[in-house]
Amino acid sequence: MWKRIDHQLKIKAGDGPQAGQFKELGPGREPAVPHPLSLSEFQTVPVFEDISQHVKEVGSQLVKKVNAIFQLDITKDGKTVHQWTIDLKNGSGDTYRGPARLPADTVFTIPEPVFMELILGKMNPQKAFLAGKFKVSGKVLLGQKLERVFKDWAKW
C-alpha cells in the first residue's frame, strides 16, 4: 500500500518541477470487499467442474490407471458443505456432485482451505494427512492415485 504521493507541478513553461510536495497518507483501511483469493465455500465448485470436464475428455485412460471411486466431503466449520464423487472405476469415468452412487473405495473428509491448498500444490498431501489436516476412510493408499489425477488435471 502506498505511504505517500509525490506531486510534481510545472507552474510556467521554463520552470522545473516544484520540489517537496508530498502528501503523507494515514494508515490504510481494510477494503470493503474481501480479498478475491479469500476462501469461501464456492471456490471448490469451479475446481470440481473443471476436473469433471477433464474426466470427460480423458476419463477412459484414467479408469484404466486408477480403477477407484473417490468421495470428497468438503467441510467448512466442521460441517459438510459440498460432497463430490470422482468415479474412475466405471465406464469412461465421471465426476458429479453428491455422495457416491456405488460404494466409494476412499472417502476424504477435508476442510475447504486445506483442499484448495492441496489442489493448488501448496501443501504436500502425505504431510497434511499425517498432520491430521484431513481424514481418509477406506483404502488410504488409493489417495496417491487421486493425487496423480489432480496433478494430471493441473497440467491439462
From Swiss-Prot:
Q: Name one Pfam family in it.
A: SCP2
Q: Which InterPro entries does the annotation name?
A: SCP2_sterol-bd_dom (IPR003033), SCP2_sterol-bd_dom_sf (IPR036527)
Q: Which domain of life is it from?
A: Eukaryota
One GO cellular component from the entry?
cytosol
Q: Which SUPFAM superfamilies has this protein been placed in? A: SCP-like
Pinpoint the SCP2 domain residues. 44-156
What's the protein called, per UniProt? SCP2 sterol-binding domain-containing protein 1
Q: What is the organism field in this record?
A: Bos taurus
